[in-house]
Each structure stands twice: as C-alpha cells, then as structure tokens.
C-alpha cells in the first residue's frame, strides 16, 4: 500500500489474537504497522509481531526486490514492534539499525549483544538524510516506554507516531476510530498523560498532514479531531457530559440500586448514562467510560469488611492511571456493617481534583423507602 510517493505500508493484520498485552480483549484483532520510506536511501520503520516475521519480510521483498534497505529505524522496543529484528538482520546484515541508546540497551536484553553489525545511535532532535527526505527524530519518553522515539518527515509532512494515536483492531475493521482508540489509550498509555502532553507540545511546532501510528489506520484527514481528543485524554479532561455507573452486586440488591439511579438520571435529562457491571463487562471498557465522562458513581456491597473484589480492582485501575478532575458518587450495601463507601473514598485520597457528592447512599440489605429517596437525591445532585 502506497501512502505517498516514496512512503509505503508493509504492516500486517493479526486476526487470531484474543488478548493484547495478555489482558485486553481484541475481538477485531490487531494491526502491527510498519512502513518503508524510499528515497535515494531506504529506511524501514519498525518491525512487527514475531508471528508475522515471514509475511513482513515478504512485504519488504515485494516492494524492494533485490534492493537492500539502508536503515531500519527502531522507534519502540516493545516486542510487537521489534520481535522480527533478528530475522530482518539475518536477511539484511549490512542494514544500519537506527535507535536511541535506551533502545539499544533493550535490544541487547532481548536479543543479546551481537545482534547489530551497524548501529546509528541517535539523540533527541537528530536528523537523517535519505535524499530529498530528511528524518527528524523526536524523543517521546514514557509514551509509553522510556525509549520511545517518533519520527517526522518534513517533505511529506508525516509523523510516524509510534504507539501514539494507535487503536485496537485490524485495518479492515469497519468501526468508529474513537471508541477503540480511547480504550487503547486509557488501557495502555493513560497513566502517562503528562508525557503525552509534552509530546503534543513538540508536535504542535510541526506541520503535520499525516500520522502513521504503529497500530490502527493511517490518519490523514481532520487531524485536528484526533489531536484534540488526545489533548483531552492526556490532560484528563472531560470528553463527554454524562455519568458512568460502575457496580458490583452479590444477590442483585446493589444492582437494583444502580438501576434505579440510572432511571432517575435519564428521567432528569442526563445526556448519557453508561452502566458497567464490573463482574461481567470488559474491564477496559469500564475504565474507558470512567475517563470519558465527567461523573462517576461506584456502587459496591461490603465484602469481608472491605470493597467487593471486582470494584477494588476497578478502582485500582483508575488510580494507577492517574484518575482526576472528576465528581464521584458512592453507593454502598451492607447487611450489618456497611463500610464500602468509606473504603472507596479512601482509595482516591491521593488522586487530584476529585470531588465527592454530598449524598452517599447506604443500602441495608435491600432497597427501602429511605434508600430510594437517597438515590433520587443523588441523581438530582449529579444533574445539577
């Protein structure tokens, strides 16, 4: 696939993968993107997952024929983008490997110290002339690994963005970009908002008309939309007005409380209510909803003098991703010593700019008139 005269796509689709990074459900598979920049000299941009080495090398051969690549640029050492380096260098031993010092250290760890015959160690801001095209290397540490580099090609106004602007799904999946890009971002990159903000500031100084990520489609239209979403996500802003309700329930009584709240919110005109049963839903989708909307309600029974395990895991997932700038409401249930609300509130004590609603709902075993009234009051408070 030719993206621009001189820039070609040589990546692969993975239709068989079920769990990405060993935890994220990917029903529509994954794309591992790789590119060739062909000028007077030729540069390969990253490799692909180890299961697709033969297909990837065949893509290179089909495009270049007997010509040998001059460079392979390693922007990111995570194995879904670097695992084929040894096979590549067995085929093209004279090709120079271009990467920063941290990436070469990781390369030694993954492959041993004798992998590369020719190394070109780059620093932040270095350039590499291919002919008419010049590659500019921009370090993007912790987006989302420490060695990450992105690459800008001035002639084509193209940014090779590593894992930035990536998404779940193969390239032939027909779906809205934002949904799976959001789930990917908050699952994998979400902790590193400050680092993404730093990269966006660097990118703002560039004239970009095309973004080539390592996962998902090449972006070449309406870039302001994608960059705007990344700015919102990485600054922990509110993307959409609405309420995410995340709940766990043992015998259905806490679920009934969550459902009543959802009904009341809708009756009051809440623009969106996203319900997540944490025992049954994809946890990454629940995390996605919690970051998408400005308000979150957590509903949990007390269990072993603590929060129900699925809820505890969910709160941990939010906090480790720097959950902030949100309003949280709490619903607890307990038959003799309800303490879940206190525990859930305490879990966010180190989080920034979290506001708890004045109304906290306590259900004593099952809903009654008092707890229903409290739920209705919570709905009104959330809709102010």
Across the structure, where does each feature detected by a protein language model lie?
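Short, charged N-terminal beta->alpha structural module
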Residues: 246-268
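Short N-terminal or domain-adjacent regulatory/targeting segments
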Residues: 212-239
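FMN-binding flavodoxin-like domain, especially the glycine-rich phosphate-binding loop
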Residues: 171-211, 215-218, 260-276, 286-384
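Active-site neighborhood of phospho(di)ester-bond hydrolases with catalytic His/Asp-centered motifs
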Residues: 45-47, 69-77, 97-100, 159-163, ...
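Active-site metal-binding motif and surrounding structural segment of the metallo-beta-lactamase
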Residues: 40, 51-98
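Conserved beta-strand hairpin/beta-sheet module of binuclear metal-dependent hydrolase folds
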Residues: 2-64, 150-153, 157-161, 254
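Short acidic active-site motifs
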Residues: 84, 282-286
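Metallo-beta-lactamase
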Residues: 2-5, 99-148, 192-198
């Amino acid at each position: 696939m030719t993206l621009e005269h001189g820039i070609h796509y040589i990546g692969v689709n993975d239709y068989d993968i079920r769990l990405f990074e060993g935890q994220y459900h990917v029903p529509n598979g994954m794309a591992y993107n790789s590119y060739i920049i062909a000028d007077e000299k030729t540069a390969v941009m990253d490799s692909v997952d180890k299961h697709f080495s033969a297909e990837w090398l065949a893509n290179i051969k089909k495009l270049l024929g007997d010509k040998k690549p001059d460079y392979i640029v390693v922007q990111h050492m995570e194995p879904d983008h670097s695992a084929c380096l040894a096979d590549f260098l067995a085929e093209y031993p004279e090709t120079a490997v271009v990467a920063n010092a941290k990436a070469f250290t990781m390369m030694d760890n993954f492959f041993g110290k004798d992998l590369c015959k020719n190394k070109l160690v780059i620093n932040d801001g270095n350039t590499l002339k291919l002919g008419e095209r010049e590659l500019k290397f921009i370090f993007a540490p912790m987006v989302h690994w420490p060695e990450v580099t992105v690459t800008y090609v001035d002639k084509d106004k193209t940014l090779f963005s590593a894992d930035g602007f990536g998404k779940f799904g193969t390239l032939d999946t027909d779906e809205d970009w934002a949904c799976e890009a959001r789930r990917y971002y908050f699952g994998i990159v979400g902790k590193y908002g400050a680092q993404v903000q730093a990269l966006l500031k660097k990118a703002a100084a560039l004239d970009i008309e095309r973004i080539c990520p390592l996962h998902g489609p090449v972006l070449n239209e309406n870039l302001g939309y994608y960059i705007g979403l990344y700015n919102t996500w990485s600054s922990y802003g509110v993307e959409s007005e609405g309420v995410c309700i995340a709940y766990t329930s043992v015998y259905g009584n806490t679920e009934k409380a969550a459902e009543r709240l959802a009904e009341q919110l809708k009756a009051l005109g809440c623009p969106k209510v996203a319900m997540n049963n944490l025992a049954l839903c994809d946890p990454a989708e629940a995390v996605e909803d919690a970051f998408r909307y400005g308000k979150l309600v957590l509903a949990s029974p007390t269990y072993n003098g603590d929060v129900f395990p699925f809820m505890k895991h969910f709160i941990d997932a939010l906090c480790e991703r720097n959950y902030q700038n949100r309003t949280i409401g709490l619903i607890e249930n307990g038959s003799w010593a309800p303490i879940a609300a206190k525990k859930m509130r305490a879990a966010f004590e180190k989080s920034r700019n979290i506001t708890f609603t004045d109304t906290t709902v306590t259900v004593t075993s099952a809903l009654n008139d008092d707890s229903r009234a409290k739920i209705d009051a919570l709905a009104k408070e959330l809709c102010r």
